[in-house]
C-alpha cells in the first residue's frame, strides 16, 4: 500500500452517468452506497453491495479513483495505491434524486 496517491492529479470533474448504479438499474438489483469514477463519470455500487459494480468498473477500465457519491462524503479512493483522498473541496453534485434501497 502506498503512502500517497500517485493519481491524485488525474482526478477529473465529471458528469455522473446515471441516477444510481448503472448496471443495477438495468438489472433491477439494489445497492448500499454509490461510487463515482472520477475519470469518466461511471456510477457504480460499493463493495458492500451485492454486485460491487464500482470495483468491477475499475478492473475493466483501470480508472483509478472513485468518489464516495451517495451519500456525498467528501472522500475518494485510489484503487491502485490503496489510499483515501480528501475531495471535500471538489465533491461532484448529484444530478437529481437518487433512489434508495433498504
Residue spans for each PLM region:
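Canonical RING-type zinc finger of E3 ubiquitin-protein ligases
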Residues: 29-38
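Cys/His-rich, Zn2+-coordinating zinc-finger modules
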Residues: 3-11, 15-20, 27, 43-102
Amino acid at each position: 500500500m502506498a503512502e500517497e496517491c500517485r493519481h491524485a492529479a488525474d482526478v477529473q470533474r465529471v458528469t455522473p452517468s446515471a441516477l444510481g448504479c448503472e448496471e443495477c438499474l438495468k438489472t433491477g438489483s439494489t445497492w448500499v452506497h454509490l461510487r463515482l469514477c472520477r475519470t469518466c463519470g461511471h456510477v457504480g455500487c460499493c463493495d458492500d453491495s451485492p454486485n460491487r459494480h464500482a470495483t468491477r468498473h475499475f478492473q475493466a477500465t483501470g480508472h483509478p479513483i472513485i468518489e464516495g457519491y451517495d451519500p456525498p462524503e467528501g472522500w475518494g479512493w485510489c484503487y491502485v495505491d490503496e489510499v483515501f483522498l480528501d475531495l471535500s473541496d471538489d465533491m461532484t453534485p448529484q444530478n437529481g434524486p437518487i433512489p434508495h434501497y433498504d
